[in-house]
């Protein structure tokens, strides 16, 4: 955990974000599963760090497939150790080259209506 021993981290004001990672061979690996979240919670507690854990539903946790964010968000919200989620969302779905208004130029995103629908579904699960 890069937070442990960090001078930049004020112990009660920082939190961890589990985004997944690339292994030594460059393969994207998720870390939003129950075992990974539990292990991270243990590390935070052991080091007397803020226990708030945010789960990134995109990036390596989705294998860079923005449509998997929905499944990841639903799974995250059901985990009692998860304090929050992070979504890649924009006005228009996907990723666009050339500066199309309302569309991400970097990572592909859920569109506005998909995000709204997902947030309403997540609210119903709380």
Predicted features and spans:
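Structured alpha-helical segments in the cores of large, soluble enzyme domains
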Residues: 6-7, 33-48, 76
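Structural preference for beta-strand elements that scaffold enzyme active sites
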Residues: 13-17, 52-54, 82-86
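Short glycine/threonine-rich loop-to-helix capping motif typified by GTGT followed
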Residues: 63-73, 95-100
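Substrate-binding cleft of secreted/luminal carbohydrate-active enzymes
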Residues: 75-95
């Amino acid at each position: 955990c890069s937070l442990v021993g960090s001078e930049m981290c004020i112990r009660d004001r920082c939190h961890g974000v589990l985004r997944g990672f690339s292994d030594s061979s460059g393969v994207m690996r998720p870390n939003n599963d129950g075992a990974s979240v539990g292990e991270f919670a243990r590390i935070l507690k052991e080091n007397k760090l803020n226990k708030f854990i945010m789960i990134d539903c995109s990036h390596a946790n989705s294998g860079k497939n923005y449509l998997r964010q929905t499944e990841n968000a639903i799974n995250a919200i059901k985990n009692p150790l998860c304090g929050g989620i992070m979504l890649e969302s924009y006005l228009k779905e996907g990723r666009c080259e050339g500066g199309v208004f309302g569309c991400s130029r970097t990572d592909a995103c859920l569109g506005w209506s998909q995000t709204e629908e997902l947030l309403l579904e997540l609210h119903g699960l709380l």
